[in-house]
Amino acid sequence: MPNIIEITDFHAPELDPYARLTQNQLRNRLEPEKGIFIAESPKVISRALDAGYPPLSLLMERKQITGPAAEILTRCGDAPVYTADRELLAALTGFELTRGVLCAFRRPAPRSVEELCKNARRVAVLEGIVDSTNVGAIFRSAAALNMDAVLINPSCCDPLCRRAVRVSMGTVFQVPWAQIGQTPADWPEKGMEQLHALGFKTAAMALSDRSVSIDDEQLAREPKLAIVLGTEGDGLARSTIAACDYTVKIPMSHGVDSLNVAAASAVAFWQLGKQ
């Protein structure tokens, strides 16, 4: 039976994950086993539950208890459900709740690059992508378009930040991912060495004099390919491009020379994810 608790004190410590903890505090790098992430909307929460993540608590509009989010409650056991009217919850969190519900989950244990890539044929590698909306959109495309895993370098946005999770529509729980390198200094040199040791050829999505078209037949023939995507503004670092086996471009019309990284990822995954 749901453990429903009416909110009477905005300063109650059990509401900290929703109201006062920063993303870094939620992530808890010093004690990752105590880390938390927040999922938003019934569909996204349902996908987190499907993936086996343990719920810690929920924050829910009062009307959702018997409304569209009611099914979620039956799946969350005795996790406390903190509730109030929509306006009070918006005042508490600082934003309007998507579909009237948030859920705090325990973060999963970090996975290793070796574990994820052992049997993978196509992986995406994200370098320095800090916009959570783009990270979420890239994960959604990766799930839909045949990527076996996503690797992020240490300067990337956390894929489990609330907005990235929401934009991904919960697909961040469906595509395996791991951080490649422990510190920014490990990328690109050590990261590239690791990918090559695992049998991958690397393809930098970038414009250069040696760029090949994304439909180049040699790319399709590679048994294991890592597609490397760079930050929104400057793209990939020169050192990263130089370390990759291929530099790949997307042919474009009307004088357009680039796409947003999320759009470019969808095109790249569609073309290079064919197996």
Indicate residue ranges for each PLM-predicted region:
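Boundary-proximal intrinsically disordered activation/regulatory segments immediately upstream
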Residues: M1-P68, C156-C157
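RNA substrate-binding interface of SAM-dependent RNA methyltransferases
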Residues: I5, A109-R210
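Anion (oxyanion) recognition and catalysis
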Residues: L49, R75, H196-A197
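Short, aromatic/basic amphipathic alpha-helical patches
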Residues: G67-D78, T240
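A glycine-rich helix N-cap at a beta->alpha junction
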Residues: R75-G94
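Structured adenosyl-cofactor binding patch, chiefly the S-adenosyl-L-methionine
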Residues: C103, S141-L145, P159-F173, R238-Q275
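Active-site/ligand-binding-proximal alpha/beta "capping" segment
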Residues: A203-H254
